[in-house]
Amino acid sequence: MNSALFLAKLPEAYAVFKPIVDILPVIPVFFLLLAFVWQAAIGFR
């Protein structure tokens, strides 16, 4: 019962981090772009 109440309160506690969670799926794309820019900088050796 106590753990169920804790889980119910969790979304409210993490409401502050919602913008960060919205950005998280985009991070792998930035790594892909970083790898491409890095390879372009060294001339695709």
From Swiss-Prot:
List the transmembrane segments: 23-43
- SUPFAM superfamilies, per database record: Photosystem II reaction center protein K, PsbK
Q: Does the keyword Membrane apply?
A: yes
Q: Does the keyword Glycosyltransferase apply?
A: no
Q: Which residues form the propeptide?
A: 1-8
What does the UniProt entry say about where the protein is found? Plastid, Chloroplast thylakoid membrane
GO cellular component terms, semicolon-separated: chloroplast thylakoid membrane; photosystem II reaction center
Gene Ontology BP term (one): photosynthesis
Q: Name one Pfam family in it.
A: PsbK
Q: How does it sit in the membrane?
A: Single-pass membrane protein
Question: What keywords sit in the KW lines?
Answer: Chloroplast, Membrane, Photosynthesis, Photosystem II, Plastid, Reaction center, Thylakoid, Transmembrane, Transmembrane helix
Quaternary structure (record): PSII is composed of 1 copy each of membrane proteins PsbA, PsbB, PsbC, PsbD, PsbE, PsbF, PsbH, PsbI, PsbJ, PsbK, PsbL, PsbM, PsbT, PsbX, PsbY, PsbZ, Psb30/Ycf12, at least 3 peripheral proteins of the oxygen-evolving complex and a large number of cofactors. It forms dimeric complexes.
What is the annotated role of this protein in its UniProt record?
One of the components of the core complex of photosystem II (PSII). PSII is a light-driven water:plastoquinone oxidoreductase that uses light energy to abstract electrons from H(2)O, generating O(2) and a proton gradient subsequently used for ATP formation. It consists of a core antenna complex that captures photons, and an electron transfer chain that converts photonic excitation into a charge separation.
State the similarity comment. Belongs to the PsbK family.
Q: What protein name applies here?
A: Photosystem II reaction center protein K
What is the originating organism of this protein? Porphyra purpurea (Red seaweed)
